[in-house]
Amino acid sequence: MEPSGSEQLFEDPDPGGKSQDAEARKQTESEQKLSKMTHNALENINVIGQGLKHLFQHQRRRSSVSPHDVQQIQADPEPEMDLESQNACAEIDGVPTHPTALNRVLQQIRVPPKMKRGTSLHSRRGKPEAPKGSPQINRKSGQEMTAVMQSGRPRSSSTTDAPTSSAMMEIACAAAAAAAACLPGEEGTAERIERLEVSSLAQTSSAVASSTDGSIHTDSVDGTPDPQRTKAAIAHLQQKILKLTEQIKIAQTARDDNVAEYLKLANSADKQQAARIKQVFEKKNQKSAQTILQLQKKLEHYHRKLREVEQNGIPRQPKDVFRDMHQGLKDVGAKVTGFSEGVVDSVKGGFSSFSQATHSAAGAVVSKPREIASLIRNKFGSADNIPNLKDSLEEGQVDDAGKALGVISNFQSSPKYGSEEDCSSATSGSVGANSTTGGIAVGASSSKTNTLDMQSSGFDALLHEIQEIRETQARLEESFETLKEHYQRDYSLIMQTLQEERYRCERLEEQLNDLTELHQNEILNLKQELASMEEKIAYQSYERARDIQEALEACQTRISKMELQQQQQQVVQLEGLENATARNLLGKLINILLAVMAVLLVFVSTVANCVVPLMKTRNRTFSTLFLVVFIAFLWKHWDALFSYVERFFSSPR
């Protein structure tokens, strides 16, 4: 199932980051669409001016048609009609249709048919199939047909005609084309602008038909949007806009924090760390810039959607549209049955002039010649056969309703009609295609009998045509005002778009200025770092050179000391060679002294070895000391003792 218009409004745009080439391509496409819209506006204004010119240059011409022209009418219409039908249908296929225009057409279809006097149940019988006739209006055949009908009708007849089934079939085909055109899946911004333009033009159009009292009126249907869905869509879009605004603020704050952190780290980092920090910061900065750009695109998109919803509203969903279309097509069947009323009443009627009122694609001024019924009655014998013929003609109109749109488009865009009299032709293509042969032939035969009646009713027809011209002028003024409002809306939309682009350019300039300042700060920081590095390198090189110089001086002093020591050793060696003999003698003397000292040491050691056992313990020590003291005492008093001993031993003798 295809998405509705409101569901398309809520779809998020494609958030993928695009390259600059894609953005430039989108800008050029949008500019092309705007230029195309302006060109279409100028063409529509030219069409309105041409219609006003035709209105005020209205002239009525009366001419007769020869039998040769009647035969040429019978032979020529089909190829020209087919060619114009193909061109007009091709033009309609290329024009996008807005759902608002579709609602207008559907409501036009749903208008109940007006029942006139003279309608019988016989006109509602089953309709036999009739050969299809082209509903296209050929310029040449239309003028000749007008001449024949004017020559063959009574002048006393009025121009009160009913809305024809051809117009109803044209409206039904317009509804089908609008339903087929309003179901695309996704559209770009430029396509939505173009669709808005077409829908606004469709709103200014009106389906023109003949009323019961003979006055020409337009049934313009007011396509009012659904207020509840519009309010819900506006609230939803406002919530999304607020959310995106907060996200943009958060992203900008995070980017500013990253910049401050980068500057802080870059000032207190060495060369390698600064390079790594710079790479990380550039990645983060690019990512944050892309995120902010995407969020800004989304915000602009939602602002555009909000303005569109506030201006145009939300149309109904396709389900309701197709249901109303089905009901409208059923009502078309009822309207088709009302065609007999206009045919029966047209016995007394006349043929009035046709003027192109507006460039609208949904309406056309339709008037049926009343003398067709009298001609058919003269051919078939009575008016009872008219409903049967009318039913077959209506079946042909239903089959060829698609070609009727070609007539409307041809009248809208073709400036070949020089005056309103040129446009005064039979717009009911099916009747003209199915009953041209018999009607024209009989009309030519009865043209002489109705000359007096034509002269008597000329004044009434002229007054009626003046009234129609006034009504047409009023409708043209309304259409002009509506078109003026439409172009004012387009102008305001273009100005809003320009303001958005200006705001976007200002934002881009601010971002560019921020990036430029950031790059300048980075360059200044790099210059400062380079200057500090130069100072550090110069100081370190000076310190190292001084250390090397000091080391060289120390090496030189050491080398000089070693040279002096070597010289002193050489001097000592030379003096030693001179005193070699003295040295030998001195050596021998020293050896003798060493030998004496060795003997003494041996003696002392022997005495010590003898004394040591006597002094190992305390008792031995005291005993040894007592013995030494005693020996010393004896040695000191040896003479006395020796004398005493001698006396001791000598006394007994």
Swiss-Prot record:
Gene Ontology CC terms: cytosol; endomembrane system; endoplasmic reticulum membrane; endoplasmic reticulum-endosome membrane contact site; rough endoplasmic reticulum
Parts of the chain on the Cytoplasmic side: 1-591, 646-653
Compositionally biased residues, Basic residues: 113-125
Subcellular location: Endoplasmic reticulum membrane
Biased amino acid composition, Polar residues: 64-74, 135-144, 204-218, 424-437
Keyword annotations of the record: Acetylation, Coiled coil, Endoplasmic reticulum, Membrane, Phosphoprotein, Transmembrane, Transmembrane helix, Transport
Coiled-coil intervals: 228-313, 458-576
Residue segments, region Disordered: 1-35, 58-78, 112-165, 204-227, 415-437
UniProt-listed GO biological process terms: endoplasmic reticulum organization; endosomal transport; endosome fission; endosome membrane tubulation; membrane fission
Transmembrane segments: 592-612, 625-645
Source organism, top-level taxon: Eukaryota
Composition bias, Low complexity: 153-165
Modified residues (N-acetylmethionine): 1
Record's bilayer topology term: Multi-pass membrane protein
One Pfam family it belongs to: Tmemb_cc2
Residue numbers bearing the Phosphoserine modification: 382, 414
Bias (Basic and acidic residues): 20-34
One of the record's GO molecular function terms: identical protein binding
UniProt function note: Endoplasmic reticulum membrane protein that promotes endoplasmic reticulum-associated endosome fission. Localizes to contact sites between the endoplasmic reticulum and endosomes and acts by promoting recruitment of the endoplasmic reticulum to endosome tubules for fission. Endosome membrane fission of early and late endosomes is essential to separate regions destined for lysosomal degradation from carriers to be recycled to the plasma membrane.
SUBUNIT field: May form homodimers and heterodimers with TMCC2 or TMCC3 via the coiled-coil domains. Interacts with ribosomal proteins RPL4 and RPS6.
Family stated for the protein in its record: Belongs to the TEX28 family.
Protein name in the entry: Transmembrane and coiled-coil domains protein 1
Organism: Homo sapiens
Gene of this entry: TMCC1
